[in-house]
Amino acid sequence: MNGGDMNQQQQQQQQQHQQQQQQWLAMQQYQQQWMAMQYPAAAMAMQQQMMYGQQYMPYYQQHQQQQKMQQSPTQIQSSSEDNKTIWIGDLQQWMDESYLHSCFSQAGEVISVKIIRNKQTGQSERYGFVEFNTHAAAEKVLQSYNGTMMPNTEQPFRLNWAGFSTGEKRAETGSDFSIFVGDLASDVTDTMLRDTFASRYPSLKGAKVVVDANTGHSKGYGFVRFGDESERSRAMTEMNGVYCSSRAMRIGVATPKKPSAHEQYSSQAVILSGGYASNGAATHGSQSDGDSSNTTIFVGGLDSEVTDEELRQSFNQFGEVVSVKIPAGKGCGFVQFSDRSSAQEAIQKLSGAIIGKQAVRLSWGRSPANKQMRTDSGSQWNGGYNGRQNYGGYGYGASQNQDSGMYATGAAYGASSNRYGNHQQPVS
């Protein structure tokens, strides 16, 4: 490249740089004016932050440098090309849809903005979703805004891909067979999980790492979808214990349940994840986690050939087993420990493990000795759950008695505005 070409290229870069500065300065001035009109109290409190003069570096350039000096608050997950929605967290109570719309309107066409609010109080849950016209626009915002300072505040944007866009939902037509994948390392992304399976199973349709809507971080489990049932069955045995990143994966079943008239969903995935929701509280098996005297575990999906003694041996490693009961023909069992801590450890570590020839599902049960045993194994997990997260028809349910601020009540994100909030989201 000769000197003339280099000078021309430098001039073009300078022009682009100046245009970018002008665009972001115009956006900042617009946001300041809008903020002063909509939120006079907040504008007064942050008057100095709003007074960006021409002699200062524009908003975008200034905070791009700050972003390089500090770690991004959220590890950005990968997403499919049809996902046009981003998650935003750490919102203040005064921030509403209009404020968020003004933050992003200059960067791309905003289709909709929704802040998730508590169903009872109406207060913001401090996170929401922004949908753009295209995937490219959403990706541009995610890459350029994440970690930069929010207008008229002293806090950075916390952004990530919305975990469950409409494009990631299971198609109504065609076969779809999924597995639950637990014990994932915190750095595992959708792409990493998919690549771990793709080389062995040609029918692989997709992979999803479930992300906490409040923190934007992985919950340590996900789902992998196949187009071929035999490959799904092979993966259940072949991939159990295989490493993805720094940890061995724990594979379990993830069988969809068609919703009833009340939109009840299967909570098999939450049972596979140890019966624990995102804040660590156990979900309802047949007894509330609040009952500290309960030491009985319900074992679902039990191989019909497993004996009482074999079941006992599987749980002995976690503590003293008081009793074991396998009701005839029910495909389930009950294991009672002498203390609750042993039962908790068993639920956490043995959920999804293979006992006999099948992966078991564990949750809190009722003691058969007290005649509180469920007579139908399905009733242990077929209840409806609020605050669900869904992936391709396979669900992770948060128990209804949880603090609504501790889990993602609206993470099953829909394309239209009536698909947000604390309501259960239908999955095709």
Curated annotation (Swiss-Prot):
A Pfam family it matches: RRM_1
Subunit annotation: Interacts with the poly(A) tail of mRNA in nucleus.
PANTHER family, A to Z: POLYADENYLATE-BINDING PROTEIN RBP47 (PTHR47640:SF66), TRNA SELENOCYSTEINE 1-ASSOCIATED PROTEIN 1-RELATED-RELATED (PTHR47640)
InterPro entries: Nucleotide-bd_a/b_plait_sf, RBD_domain_sf, RBM42_RBP45_47-like, RRM_dom
Localization per record: Nucleus; Cytoplasmic granule
Keyword match Chloroplast: no
Residue ranges occupied by any RRM domain in the UniProt entry: 84-164, 177-256, 295-367
Name of the molecule in the record: Polyadenylate-binding protein RBP47
Keywords, alphabetical: mRNA processing, Nucleus, Repeat, RNA-binding, Stress response
Family (UniProt): Belongs to the polyadenylate-binding RBP47 family.
Function (record text): Heterogeneous nuclear ribonucleoprotein (hnRNP)-protein binding the poly(A) tail of mRNA and probably involved in some steps of pre-mRNA maturation.
The keyword Ribosomal protein appears for this protein: no
CDD domains documented for this protein: RRM1_SECp43_like, RRM2_SECp43_like
Tissue and organ distribution: Constitutively expressed in leaves, roots, and stems.
PROSITE patterns per record: RRM
